Amino acid sequence: MPLYEHVFLARQDASTQQVEELTTQITGVIEGLGGKVVKMEAWGVRSLTYRMNKNRKAHFVLLNIDGPSAVVAEVERQERINEDVIRYLTVRVDEHEEGPSAMMRKADRDRDRDERGGGGFRGDREGGFRGDREGGGFRGDRGPRRPRDDAPAATEE
């Protein structure tokens, strides 16, 4: 049977429980038509690149599906009807990716960075070379403006 990756975005004001129920409903449709959900990943609430239907964030869910094309057609029809689904995309793939998806690996990498204490206070900025400023302090006033040589002066009539 053909393999598909299916991602749908649910409205941000839908609770996590509602998104799980929606995912369960979609999984039921897939299995009812002879398909199989190989993997399901909930990526959580993420910011959208641009506003969609007045939403700036959405719940992202990935489903790896093994089933006939009729399954995909019915899932997309159900999502078109459902008001909680903002967008969906189904792509046919040659084989499913083993292990966590790229989005989950990125989330793990970000979590590891937070645990290491990345960001935060990086020390004093005093000292170091600051060009013409002694000790890296305040530059002081600029001084008076010098006259312009390249433009003719405006004449009053």
Curated annotation (Swiss-Prot):
InterPro entries, A to Z: Ribosomal_bS6, Ribosomal_bS6_sf, Ribosomal_S6_plastid/chlpt, Transl_elong_EF1B/ribsomal_bS6
Any one Gene Ontology cellular component term annotated for this protein: cytosolic small ribosomal subunit
Compositional bias ranges of the Basic and acidic residues kind: 96-151
Chain positions covered by the region annotation Disordered: 96-157
GO molecular function ontology, one term from the record: small ribosomal subunit rRNA binding
Pfam family membership, one: Ribosomal_S6
UniProt keyword terms in alphabetical order: Ribonucleoprotein, Ribosomal protein, RNA-binding, rRNA-binding
Function: Binds together with bS18 to 16S ribosomal RNA.
Similarity comment: Belongs to the bacterial ribosomal protein bS6 family.
Descriptive protein name: Small ribosomal subunit protein bS6
Phylogenetic classification of the source organism: Bacteria, Pseudomonadati, Pseudomonadota, Alphaproteobacteria, Hyphomicrobiales
Gene designation: rpsF
